[in-house]
């Protein structure tokens, strides 16, 4: 009986994990609600694990890996 209970609990957790992927390419390119970031694995969150482009963020990403803008040019003299 204990083995059956354990197996049932394990399968329930497995199904819950599989259906928890709710954004990005794993979920028809859906975006997260409330401006949360979508991780590379299809989960919504607000920490760097979800939001960093370097970590594979899919949508609503912040920072992490952009090349940055070029600096302004030096002032030119008259010809």
UniProtKB/Swiss-Prot annotation:
Record-level Gene Ontology MF annotations: chitin binding
Protein name per Swiss-Prot or TrEMBL: Morintide mO2
BP-aspect Gene Ontology terms: defense response to fungus; killing of cells of another organism
Keywords tagged on the record: Antimicrobial, Chitin-binding, Disulfide bond, Fungicide, Signal
UniProt KW DNA-binding keyword: no
Domain Chitin-binding type-1: 21-63
SS bonds (residue pairs): 23-38, 32-44, 37-51, 57-61
Annotated signal sequence range: 1-20
Native source species: Moringa oleifera (Horseradish tree)
Recorded superkingdom: Eukaryota
């Amino acid at each position: 009986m204990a083995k059956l209970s354990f197996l049932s609990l394990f399968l329930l957790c497995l199904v819950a994990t599989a259906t928890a992927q709710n954004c990005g390419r794993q979920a028809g390119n859906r975006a997260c609600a409330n401006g949360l970031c979508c991780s590379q694995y299809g989960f919504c969150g607000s920490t760097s694990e979800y939001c960093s482009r370097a970590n594979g963020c899919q949508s609503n990403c912040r920072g992490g890996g952009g090349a940055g803008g070029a600096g302004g040019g030096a002032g030119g003299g008259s010809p």
